[in-house]
């Protein structure tokens, strides 16, 4: 963060890298409170995201918590390009139709083909990448569960422009989303292993234990 004093807007602010402008007649208390408000906002955001991961791992909730931070629509898809979650604003604005899932809960074909063509997309691409679509910057990063590709996160900067400081923030957020998706995959993998065990037990003609019966009924 850079705090400048003077009688005119500093040139660096025009670059779009900074989101806080303090006017020349602000006193020290106002400046201090403004800085604290910024830190409080990001601290509350981080705590809310981590609490969500620890409890429900609700990806949709994580996206809604993050809209005030990025001020742009966010989409999370799985390894087969099916939607896991997307920002609620996408359904409220017709100009965001391209980011809505189609009838198969997948990306619109036109946007998907553009993404694949313009970024040379590959599931092995671990570093974040940017693409330009209709003059707007789109941040994209793949998600992994260990070494396994499990999806992708995209933030389309169509409401406010992409700033230099957004890159590290997007990467940090993507790691938290990755933790949530990985947790859901771990739960799913555990259920699959349990069901396989129960199926083999039934094939052998062995009675199920009370715990196995309870698992099947839930």
Language-model regions: role of each:
Residues 1-218:
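Hydrophobic, helix-rich cores of sensory/ligand-binding and other regulatory modules
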